[in-house]
Amino acid sequence: MYYFNYFFVMSIIGHFIESFFYSSKDSGILMGYWTPIYGIGTIIILLINKYIDKFKINKIFKIIFLFVLSSITLAIIEAIGGYLIKWIFNLELWDYSNHKFNIGKYTSIEMSLIWGLSSIILIYFIKPLLDKIIKKIPKVITYILIILFIFDLSITLINK
């Protein structure tokens, strides 16, 4: 349930972040107040951090590895997400063509660095606070969110 709860909490937070920064544009493809790419990215960061924690290295190297692995992995996920949304829904929700160091339309080195920094902020500042809340979410709430998400995704795909 831990990862499901993180997925939903960060997808919802991601939706509001997108709405705040891009208030003139719809921040996603789903009806609900969630932007799944943030939830997926969070799960990936948590798994990368779990993998790095297996190694007996000092904290500085852990932070560097987290930054590098998250930057690369999340840039790839962002690019795949952009192409999938374009292919499935014929929508372009973001376009980094104007970035100096873009790698195609859907990712750039600038954004990759932001994702790397965000992963450090998530693991070392947000996660310690959020873990206390995440672990207390009742299973029934998680199951309800899963059902609502599947319903939302199904309706969205049917109406594409």
What do these predicted regions represent?
Residues 1-160:
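Aromatic-rich, lipid-facing transmembrane alpha helices and their immediate juxtamembrane interface loops
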